[in-house]
Amino acid sequence: MIMAQNAKHRVPFRRRREGKTDFRQRLGLLLSGKPRLVARKSLNNIIAQLMAYDEKGDIVLVSAHSRELVKMGYKGHCGNLPAAYLTGLLLGKKAVEEGLEEAILDKGLHRATKGAAIFAVLKGALDAGMDIPCGEEIIADEERLNGTHIKQYAELLKEDEEAYKKQFSKYLEKGLNPEDLPEHFEELKGKILNL
């Protein structure tokens, strides 16, 4: 543990020491006065929230979780790019219905890597009708967002039946061939847009 020893040593805030918050970035986002689109990814899930600042703590205005997609009939993995896009689309749809059409992306301590899941959530929210400033070059290609890359990998792996069944066991358990993921994605996208 770091201890302050003299006037020259300054102890960073606890959340900065724990690697959870970049306060300089947070201040810039809060000064915009817009709600923040917060997207976080774990190995198996995507969480997207629209947050507003309050002195007592941030308030969640609208939220969406990739597990909500399963309730809507999604059979794919809840932690991949298509799930991230659909979660963002669901969040955006809910936000527009609540009258929250403007936001700013809060990427937290994540690096801005082209095609990352955070930007797939952002693209989903944009397609739902939200106004969020971003550069188009950072968002993944349409083929990656709809799962075509998973389909291509499944077709490549199908030559080795054992490896195919091991890699896509959850898909097959749920009754979805990985080769049909782009069509399944479009079906669920239409379902979300018609809510």
Swiss-Prot record:
One of its GO terms (cellular component) is cytosolic large ribosomal subunit. One of its GO terms (molecular function) is structural constituent of ribosome. The keyword Ribosomal protein applies. GO terms for biological process: ribosomal large subunit assembly; translation. Keywords: Ribonucleoprotein, Ribosomal protein, RNA-binding, rRNA-binding. Pfam families: Ribosomal_L5e. InterPro entries: Rbsml_uL18_euk. Part of the 50S ribosomal subunit. Contacts the 5S and 23S rRNAs. Belongs to the universal ribosomal protein uL18 family. PANTHER family: LARGE RIBOSOMAL SUBUNIT PROTEIN UL18 (PTHR23410:SF12), RIBOSOMAL PROTEIN L5-RELATED (PTHR23410). This is Large ribosomal subunit protein uL18. It comes from Methanococcus vannielii. The gene is rpl18.
